[in-house]
Swiss-Prot record:
Species this chain originates from: Nitrosomonas europaea (strain ATCC 19718 / CIP 103999 / KCTC 2705 / NBRC 14298)
Xref: InterPro entries: Ribosomal_bS16, Ribosomal_bS16_CS, Ribosomal_bS16_dom_sf
The protein's name in its UniProt record: Small ribosomal subunit protein bS16
Pfam family, one: Ribosomal_S16
NCBIfam families: S16 (TIGR00002)
Family indicated by similarity: Belongs to the bacterial ribosomal protein bS16 family.
Lineage: Bacteria, Pseudomonadati, Pseudomonadota, Betaproteobacteria, Nitrosomonadales
GO cellular component: cytoplasm; small ribosomal subunit
Amino acid sequence: MVVVRLARGGAKKRPFYSMVVADSRNRRDGKFIERVGFYNPRATGGEESLRIQMDRLTYWQSKGAQLSDTVSRLVKQFGRQQKAAQPQE
């Protein structure tokens, strides 16, 4: 089964996560098919904390990929950020 999940990177006590499409049998930080975004929980100031390539994510979902619980939460958060960033008419 193909899943979209977070793969941990970064240094000790400074996590950085890549949002990857991977086979569920592979290790968390192991081999993956495609990187579709990132999440930086320790972003400060003007740094970008979350980026998702929504076109690629919807493509993989159409192919049957399942989102992990955390990725589902982050996708909703990203949608709210995008909606808030759009200028009001």
